[in-house]
Swiss-Prot record:
It catalyses: dTDP-beta-L-rhamnose + NADP(+) = dTDP-4-dehydro-beta-L-rhamnose + NADPH + H(+). The record marks 104 as: Could provide a fine-tuning to achieve optimal pKa matching between active site and substrate. This is dTDP-4-dehydrorhamnose reductase. Its cofactor is Mg(2+). Its EC number is 1.1.1.133. Pathway: Carbohydrate biosynthesis; dTDP-L-rhamnose biosynthesis; Bacterial outer membrane biogenesis; LPS O-antigen biosynthesis. NADPH binds at residues 11-12, 39-40, 63-65, 102, 128, 132. DTDP-beta-L-rhamnose binds at residues 104-105, 153. InterPro entries: dTDP_dehydrorham_reduct, NAD(P)-bd_dom_sf, RmlD-like-bd. GO terms for molecular function: dTDP-4-dehydrorhamnose reductase activity; metal ion binding. NADH binds at residues 10-12, 30, 39-40, 63-65, 128, 132. Belongs to the dTDP-4-dehydrorhamnose reductase family.
Amino acid sequence: MNILLFGKTGQVGWELQRALAPLGNLIALDVHSTDYCGDFSNPEGVAETVKKIRPDVIVNAAAHTAVDKAESEPNFAQLLNATCVEAIAKAANEVGAWVIHYSTDYVFPGNGDTPWLETDATAPLNVYGETKLAGEKALQEHCAKHLIFRTSWVYAGKGNNFAKTMLRLAKEREELAVINDQFGAPTGAELLADCTAHAIRVAANKPEVAGLYHLVAGGTTTWHDYAALVFEEARRAGINLALNKLNAVPTTAYPTPARRPHNSRLNTEKFQQNFALVLPDWQVGVKRMLNELFTTTAI
């Protein structure tokens, strides 16, 4: 199996390099690649890459994910999240390749308290959500052999993440205020990559699984409770924190250019049934990431 990966250096892309390697021959690209074009600001170049390589599977982990920045550069977000996805979809259809693509809960209006189903009506709150929805539609229209995984609250051990930011602040400050009215499931890039590799194997033998899926870790939390778990684990590991008070505040306490959904819960039953997988509780992955952080780096 020949696999083409776009966005190899992002949170999910980095883990995909590991998870996809046993499936076959992997060509991994990013914006700086020189052998082939992996620059999503150049849709024609990216489409040409697909036609040259003629892969069996394309995994797209590249995107414009700066949610607030997208509000001030909607055309650039549209180019990366929709126009380029359409170019890939058309080229993939031409060469007979599968396309695996990641989307977001931001395609929904973010109200209510019920986990969103794949069949629920979309109504994005911001530019990022609008462009990601446009990318989904382009892929669905132009390439039948696709898997779209909507995910949420993605983190990775590599690079910056919410937990590391909270730990840094908790060492500097005695009091912190964290949002407690946004609900979701922190989902590890490791989990996304491993589930993707498994799904590709299933799709190769059962093409009828093509379609749209929700893919997040199990359970639900808030940013406030997520932070509380991080601090609890840090103290258990013997890390000294200056923090002695963690306040819960509403989203309105931190105004941002892009509106944020209150309800980022996603129903994953369809994914678990079709791919015969179990999605572990969010705490499993977060605790593992923290354990690695505490034992391998001077934080």
